[in-house]
C-alpha cells in the first residue's frame, strides 16, 4: 500500500512557491538602478512568473510550455553561474556576498535550484517529504541571506553606489 500524502504537504508546497515568487519579484525590482538592470530583471521575473503559476496550480509543471521555458532558463542560468564561479575563483578578494559577482552568482544558483526543484515536481506536484524539505531550505536561504547582508554594516559599506540606494 502506497503511503498517503500528508494533508499539509500541498499547502506547504504552494506556500514555498508563493514566497519564492515574491522573492524573485523583489529581486527583480531591486535591480532598477543596476547598470545591467534589464538583464537581471528578466533573470528574476521569469522564475517569478513560473513559480507563481506553480503556486496557483502545481500541475502546471507538467505543461510543455512551462517545462520548456523553465528548462531553457535553467540552462542559461547554470551556464552563466558557471562563468561567474570561474571569474569569482580567479578574482575573489573577499567573502562571496561581499563581491557583486558573488551576489550575482548566489542569485543564479538560487534561481537554478528552485526551477530544478519545480521542474522535478511534475511527477509528484504535492511533493514528497524530501522534496518539501529541500523546498523549505531553498525558500529560507534567500531570506536569511538578505537579512545577514542588510544587518552587516561592514558588508554594506563595500557595496557599489547602485546597491546602496535601492532599499
UniProtKB/Swiss-Prot annotation:
The chain crosses the membrane at residues 10-30, 40-60, 69-89, 104-122, 130-150. GO terms for cellular component: membrane. Signal peptide: none annotated. It comes from the Eukaryota. InterPro entries: TMEM220. It is found in: Membrane. It is a multi-pass membrane protein. Its main location: membrane. Keywords: Membrane, Transmembrane, Transmembrane helix. This is Transmembrane protein 220. It comes from Mus musculus (Mouse). The gene is Tmem220.
Amino acid at each position: 500500500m502506497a503511503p498517503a500524502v500528508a494533508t499539509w504537504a500541498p499547502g506547504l508546497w504552494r506556500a514555498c512557491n508563493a514566497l519564492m515568487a515574491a522573492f524573485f519579484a523583489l529581486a527583480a525590482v531591486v535591480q532598477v538602478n543596476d547598470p545591467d538592470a534589464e538583464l537581471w530583471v528578466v533573470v528574476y521575473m521569469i522564475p517569478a512568473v513560473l513559480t507563481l503559476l506553480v503556486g496557483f496550480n502545481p500541475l502546471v509543471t507538467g505543461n510543455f510550455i512551462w517545462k520548456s521555458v523553465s528548462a531553457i532558463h535553467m540552462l542559461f542560468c547554470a551556464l552563466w553561474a558557471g562563468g561567474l564561479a570561474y571569474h569569482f575563483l580567479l578574482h575573489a578578494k573577499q567573502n562571496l556576498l561581499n563581491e557583486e559577482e558573488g551576489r550575482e552568482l548566489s542569485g543564479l544558483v538560487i534561481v537554478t535550484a528552485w526551477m530544478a526543484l519545480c521542474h522535478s515536481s511534475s511527477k509528484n506536484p504535492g511533493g514528497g517529504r524530501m522534496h518539501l524539505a529541500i523546498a523549505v531550505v531553498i525558500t529560507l536561504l534567500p531570506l536569511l541571506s538578505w537579512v545577514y547582508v542588510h544587518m552587516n554594516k561592514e558588508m554594506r559599506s563595500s557595496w557599489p553606489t547602485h546597491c546602496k540606494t535601492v532599499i
